[in-house]
Amino acid sequence: MRVIFMGTPDFSVPALRAIAARHQVVAVYSQPPRAAGRGQKPRPSPVHRAAEELGLPVRTPERLKSPQDQGDFAALQADVAVVVAYGLILPQPVLEAPWLGCLNIHASLLPRWRGAAPIHRAIMAGDAETGVAIMQMEAGLDTGPVLAEARTTIGAEDTTADLHDRLAEMGAALIVETLHRLPLPAEPQPAEGVTYAQKIDKAEARIDWGRPAAQVDRQIRGLSPFPGAWCLIGGERVKLLRSRLAAGSGAPGRVLSGFTIACGEGAVEVLEAQREGKRPMPAAEILRGMALPDRLD
């Protein structure tokens, strides 16, 4: 099958590799290289780098609105396009160019968590499970009919990083299975149960110890590794990256023992944290180099 692959971040790479091992990938579309690092030199995206490793042709248009870009896309004569966190809106002529259309791997069980940050939001909301969906793309935001889905439980200590990696592999396996079975009937999304995963705002990252422990724990895990939920310790901003619910109670922010902190209801034990300019470290290692005050702000 002739496939166009469209993706940009690390999440997309397992799907690209899985498809390239089984189908003819006629082109890989990714966002243009962006300035990154201390030198602010343009750096190709993870998908761009993976495509080059696989010897696949890469295209990096700024947008796909011009007749030239759309004509170049159609000229590839692809059977299908697979879109995984590409980051650009696809105009209708692009959506209609492959005879099997454009399929999207979305990291939620649609229609729950349409939008930009479905993994973060599922954890932060306390969802018991999530998954990946293969959706036939249309003009609306994640509104297309669903061809296939796979589910996974969200563990009590899962972070966004953990779930990201698991869902990326699940999506890769599911898209390979779906491509093998095309054409497939697609199930329209139900009108009930629609929620939107708004993009994460860094203002959401400051920890309020007055909230219930369950909410603080989900905030820490849901925002790990980026942007990282944080609190001030001795005037230093420290990111808290892993946690679990713990026994105990006290005034919000009070250090009960080790790195166990009282919340508005219950307590949270911090398992991993990151000081400014340092690598992430287990809580025990953090505590060897930093004394916690009696109470955190």
From Swiss-Prot:
Residues that span the membrane, as ranges: none
UniProt-listed InterPro entries: Fmt (IPR005794), Formyl_trans_C (IPR005793), Formyl_transf_N (IPR002376), Formyl_transf_N_sf (IPR036477), Formyl_transferase-like_C_sf (IPR011034), Met-tRNA-FMT_C (IPR044135), Met-tRNA-FMT_N (IPR041711)
Entry EC no(s): 2.1.2.9
CC terms in the record's Gene Ontology section: cytosol
GO molecular function: methionyl-tRNA formyltransferase activity
Similarity annotation: Belongs to the Fmt family.
Superkingdom per UniProt: Bacteria
Record region (Disordered): 31-52
Reactions it catalyzes: L-methionyl-tRNA(fMet) + (6R)-10-formyltetrahydrofolate = N-formyl-L-methionyl-tRNA(fMet) + (6S)-5,6,7,8-tetrahydrofolate + H(+)
Pfam families linked to this entry: Formyl_trans_C, Formyl_trans_N
Functional summary from the UniProt entry: Attaches a formyl group to the free amino group of methionyl-tRNA(fMet). The formyl group appears to play a dual role in the initiator identity of N-formylmethionyl-tRNA by promoting its recognition by IF2 and preventing the misappropriation of this tRNA by the elongation apparatus.
NCBIfam families: fmt (TIGR00460)
The species this protein was found in: Paracoccus denitrificans (strain Pd 1222)
Regions annotated as coiled coil: none
Protein name: Methionyl-tRNA formyltransferase
